[in-house]
A protein has these predicted regions:
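The feature marks the mature, well-folded catalytic cores of soluble enzymes
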Residues: 2-179
């Protein structure tokens, strides 16, 4: 599926999901301009993978994604502070869904994590559990929880959901240690 009208798609050199489009942009180093008819996180992903000589242009700067907007960099930093105060941050490996902002992806990398797509989420979680005891899955709680429970046999009680609108995410230090 795509989010552009057919009148726009007919002029596209490449179509696909966000990760494919970012990889395709990077595979064309001769392209001086990458005009990205998508949303912010998609253009940011392409910009991360392309060379400094390439300019990624997003024609509609108001094009956002509710999934990517589920967690802001500030909220994630606050969550990490809560994990630190609970004494578990050193056991946590962040895993972020491709549909997240460049700031969230940078946070994930800075803290030794990885970025996943819906098709490799299980492999990403398996890798993360090899690195640490706990996972902070961003920004989509459903993909993280469903993968852990349905595909990896974890219990729903093994997963807690941090709510950035509540003090300490609505979680106690004990809940964070037990998750």
């Amino acid at each position: 599926h795509h989010y552009q009208r057919d009148e726009v798609i007919q002029f596209a050199d490449v179509t696909g999901d966000s990760f494919k489009l970012a990889r395709d942009a990077a595979a064309r180093p001769e392209a001086e301009y990458i005009v990205f008819c998508g949303v912010h996180f998609m253009a940011e992903s392409a910009d991360i993978l392309t060379t400094d000589a390439q300019a990624v242009v997003l024609p509609d700067l108001a094009a956002g994604c509710s999934m990517a907007d589920m967690a802001s960099a500030e909220q994630v930093a606050e969550c990490w502070d809560v994990l630190t105060e609970a004494g578990v941050a050193d056991q946590v490996v962040p895993v972020s869904y491709m549909n997240s902002s460049a700031d969230i992806k940078a946070f994930t990398g800075k803290h030794g994590g990885t970025i996943c797509t819906s098709s490799n989420a299980k492999r990403a979680l398996e890798w993360a559990f090899e690195q640490g005891e706990k996972i902070l899955f961003l920004p989509d709680q459903h993909l993280g929880r469903n993968t852990a429970v349905r595909d990896m046999g974890m219990g729903l009680d093994d997963c807690v959901v941090y709510n950035p609108h509540k003090p300490n995410g609505g979680l106690t230090a004990e809940q964070l240690r037990d998750a």
